[in-house]
């Protein structure tokens, strides 16, 4: 049984028993290749969420009308990626086993792999929808296969061809894009094709895991991330994409790669809080 966290994300104070979504944090950034700090993302999102309203004028919905339980952050071993992933998988599996939707707060993007490992064990026909600036399809990065630069490649190892759908991708090496052309459903630069994909996912009624790397946003809107990439989407474009894809059968999700100390203005953290609020509302009240 999970116990109440000390500092919750705003409006997420339901009991575990009544919750439809359970938040859990993975403060891990040990494989960061450029600018570290994503381990501080989950705590910053919770703390700064109190500058945000529970009500969304975009959706005319309020978190106080929803049942969300915030279980706090996992205690992860920074020196062992595999150990951290095992702990993340265990927490996600527990939440799924209890019939609830696990929503993970990163942390660097590698943390997604632990959640996907749990999800694919319950849903063998799982699909992943991936919003990101980076393809994350390297087979290894500097010899390490468990790296934030390899997370979608490791997910492909679990799911196989045609079940990973990538959007906003605008960075990666040549081999990653060649791999994507053969093995994933890649949509470069923006959300073109997302509506058509969502229509198909709904018709097929397949389980979907949604992973959002916040560096899909343009650095002008979201500079506080480890590997910023110019040419990203706007907040409103991301909000529209969230409202579209959550019409599908979302069984798990994550929001990752906020590094709050890299943006002293606090704008990036405030944006991450708003993305999380809109995602929660879109999933729970569709």
Per-range role (PLM):
Residues 1-286:
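Conserved alpha-helical scaffold segments that buttress catalytic/binding sites
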